[in-house]
UniProtKB/Swiss-Prot annotation:
UniProt family annotation: Belongs to the XseB family.
Protein EC: 3.1.11.6
Residues in coiled coil: none
Protein name in the entry: Exodeoxyribonuclease 7 small subunit
Function: Bidirectionally degrades single-stranded DNA into large acid-insoluble oligonucleotides, which are then degraded further into small acid-soluble oligonucleotides.
One function term, GO molecular function aspect: exodeoxyribonuclease VII activity
Superkingdom of origin: Bacteria
Reactions mediated catalytically: Exonucleolytic cleavage in either 5'- to 3'- or 3'- to 5'-direction to yield nucleoside 5'-phosphates
GO biological process: DNA catabolic process
A cellular component annotation (GO) from this entry: exodeoxyribonuclease VII complex
Subunit field text: Heterooligomer composed of large and small subunits.
Length: 78
């Protein structure tokens, strides 16, 4: 059953996206239902990405207003 994404917090968005992925991975949905689930998943992924970008912007603003160390890119090699 296709879910309608509404404005959710990040954790709820991620949980719904995981449910959509699980349902699609089962592979037993009719084509039309699978397409609706896929569309819902795309919308949820976009919503989650937007939430992450907003959080990153807030962190950057907070760091600029404080006297803490500058924000640097993460590198797994370090």
């Amino acid at each position: 059953m296709a879910r309608k994404p509404v404005e959710l917090d990040f954790e709820s968005t991620l949980a719904q996206l995981e449910a959509v992925v699980t349902e699609l991975e089962r592979g037993d949905l009719p084509l039309e239902s699978a397409l609706k689930e896929f569309e819902t998943g795309i919308k949820l992924a976009k919503q989650g990405q937007e939430r992450l970008q907003q959080a990153e912007q807030r962190i950057q603003i907070l760091l600029q207003k404080s006297d803490t160390a500058p924000l640097t890119d993460y590198s797994a090699d370090e």
